[in-house]
A protein has these predicted regions:
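Terminal alpha-helical anchor/extension segments at protein ends
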Residues: 203-207, 220, 288-334
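C-terminal non-catalytic interaction/assembly regions of soluble proteins
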Residues: 237, 241-294, 300-304, 311-314
Length: 334
């Protein structure tokens, strides 16, 4: 987690430096002798995972208000008074990790963590916190309240999962009789009205003709996801053959999605283990019978999930890294 601290007094600055020594991050001083708060907040909202204000809560609220977008996008925001008595998560308590961060910071300076989210206050299962713990993206953040609201009202909720989830489900959480009856689902292929939690375990294997533009790759990728009902939020990186290292369109496409690229030689691709779609033409050009499937499997160190798909000179495939979800959702659970 990338943290950024700001304080407004000498006492607050000393506390910020103490906190940063335990939870590393940059430290700035705001006010007449320091950075401009509006500029600092805008910059850190764009580049940091967590913003920590050491000062009045009202200062933090006014500073962050223009930048708040959604549960899924906003960084964690925590405020501590300059005396280090209280640590209050203001924004992104679960998905952004502000609740956990507030507790960590409170432990450093012996403050009281002030956690105000209803599920935490009542000890009720928090589906968004569980998603974060399992390294899942939340496809529809607006549906979180439906699951949490039902549990807070004393009702049960049903889940579906495409993987076995180890351990005992939390109180009030039961397996759905059918996938289309689930209130929330752990899946890479979301359908229906459930809250979908998308494991970040997928690697996109890419093959393309020389000179393929980012726009053409984007169009192909959108069609690929639509045809397979695949959630793009599950992709964590992309992979291809080293012959594509200098393709500007491929680089721009991956950069737009925030994916790093892995490139493999033909010899390395031939070592991949799975059942692959073989092409004599691809073999004659690249020295290996398949690029997208083999590259995805190697980069994921896992198994092929969606086999080779081709359109307009673009080939795509998806492989999955090993994934073993469990029902732990609190940091103090073993």
């Amino acid at each position: 987690m990338t943290c950024a601290y700001i304080a407004f007094t000498a006492r607050g600055l000393a506390l910020a430096q103490q906190l940063a020594a335990a939870c590393p991050g940059s430290v700035a001083r705001g006010g007449a002798d320091g950075v401009r708060l509006t500029d600092w907040t805008a910059a850190q909202f764009a580049q940091s995972d967590a913003l920590i204000f050491v000062g009045a809560a009202g200062i933090a609220v006014r500073a962050i208000a223009p930048h708040c977008r959604s549960k899924a996008a906003d960084p964690a925001v925590v405020v501590l008074d300059e005396g280090g008595q209280f640590a209050i998560p203001l924004l992104s308590g679960h998905l952004g990790g502000a609740n956990e961060l507030a507790q960590r910071l409170a432990a450093v300076c012996h403050a009281v963590p002030v956690i105000t989210t209803a599920t935490d206050g009542r000890g009720v299962f928090a589906v968004d916190e569980w998603a974060k713990r399992q390294n899942c993206a939340v496809a529809e953040p607006e549906r979180i309240r439906c699951v949490s609201g039902a549990l807070l009202a004393g009702q049960s909720v049903c889940y579906a999962a495409d993987w076995a989830v180890s351990g005992m489900p939390p109180a009030g959480v039961e397996p759905a009789a059918a996938a289309d009856r689930a209130d929330f689902a752990l899946t890479l292929t979301p359908t229906g009205e459930a809250l979908h939690l998308i494991p970040r375990i997928a690697v996109l294997g890419v093959g393309c003709k020389r000179g393929t533009t980012a726009e053409k790759l984007e169009t192909a990728f959108a069609a690929f996801c639509a045809e397979h009902h695949f959630a793009p939020q599950g992709i964590v990186r992309a992979a291809s053959i080293d012959l594509k290292k200098d393709e500007p369109g491929l680089a721009a496409f991956c950069r737009a999605h925030g994916w790093e690229m892995d490139f493999y030689t033909a010899a390395a691709l031939r070592t991949a283990k799975d059942r692959f779609t073989s092409s004599g033409f691809v073999q004659s050009i690249t020295g290996v019978d398949n690029v997208c499937e083999r590259a995805a499997v190697l980069a994921a160190d896992g198994v092929l999930f969606i086999p080779k798909w081709a359109r307009d000179g673009v080939t795509l495939a998806v492989a999955l890294a090993p994934f073993a979800p469990d029902w732990r959702w609190k940091n103090d659970e073993p």
